[in-house]
Amino acid sequence: MPPKKDAKSSAKQPQKTQKKKEGSGGGKAKKKKWSKGKVRDKLNNQVLFDKATYEKLYKEVPAYKLITPSVVSERLKIRGSLAKRALIELREKGLIKQVVQHHSQVIYTRATKGDEA
């Protein structure tokens, strides 16, 4: 009698394992890892003008086609607030012309010779 029991139990076990294999298709997936994220460089922009940057402002900025505080800040490596004040000063002196005034962004362009007259 014992050999018959072994045969039945061994016959049942393969069926159980087969069912487990079929059902495990939609089981646990690998856990997603967190990405490190992008690291930005620290901007070390000037807070005040030095003589060289101030001269560069008067020489180069009026020649730009599109002048915004962000463009000036990036090219001259100065803070955005300083760039805003510098552009207001250039506008008052007539070196650049204001195109659009938005509540958060001001756009200027170079003053053409026809505008100065």
UniProtKB/Swiss-Prot annotation:
Coiled coil: none annotated. Keywords: Ribonucleoprotein, Ribosomal protein. Residues 28-37 have a biased composition (Basic residues). GO terms for biological process: cytoplasmic translation. Pfam families: Ribosomal_S25. GO terms for cellular component: cytosolic ribosome; cytosolic small ribosomal subunit. The keyword Calcium does not apply. Transmembrane segments: none annotated. Residues 1-38 are annotated as: Disordered. One of its GO terms (molecular function) is structural constituent of ribosome. Belongs to the eukaryotic ribosomal protein eS25 family. PANTHER family: 40S RIBOSOMAL PROTEIN S25. This is Small ribosomal subunit protein eS25. It comes from Drosophila melanogaster (Fruit fly). The lineage of its organism: Eukaryota, Metazoa, Ecdysozoa, Arthropoda, Hexapoda. The gene is RpS25.
